[in-house]
A protein has these predicted regions:
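Short, charged beta-turn/beta-strand-edge "cap" motif at the junction between a beta-strand
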Residues: 1, 20, 42-47
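Short alpha-helix capping/helix-loop boundary micro-motifs
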Residues: 22-26, 36
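Short, conserved secondary-structure segments in the cores of folded domains
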Residues: 2, 26-28, 48
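Short, structured beta-strand/loop micro-motifs enriched in basic residues and often containing a Trp
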Residues: 10-23
Length: 73
């Protein structure tokens, strides 16, 4: 499932970040790697998705969230 599909207050784990090297560099620089656990804080349709991961609150734009495969934990 994509990150945009998880509801607020749900926990998940990053399953795959895709193969786009520019995208991989960007998301790994903010601490998101495969296997990273997180909690969805906010997921409104027109706003960035807010997640809490590695003791940090991150806002990820929706188009990037479509590239991130997750599994519910």
């Amino acid at each position: 499932m994509k990150l945009t599909e998880l509801k607020p207050d749900k926990n998940g784990k990053i399953k795959s970040l895709g193969e786009d090297e520019l995208f991989l560099n960007r998301v790994t620089s903010i601490g998101l790697t495969e296997g990273t656990p997180f909690q969805v804080v906010r997921n409104d349709r027109k706003m960035p998705v807010l997640i809490y991961a590695r003791e940090t609150l991150l806002a990820i734009n929706r188009s990037d969230c479509e590239k991130i495969e997750v599994e519910e934990a």
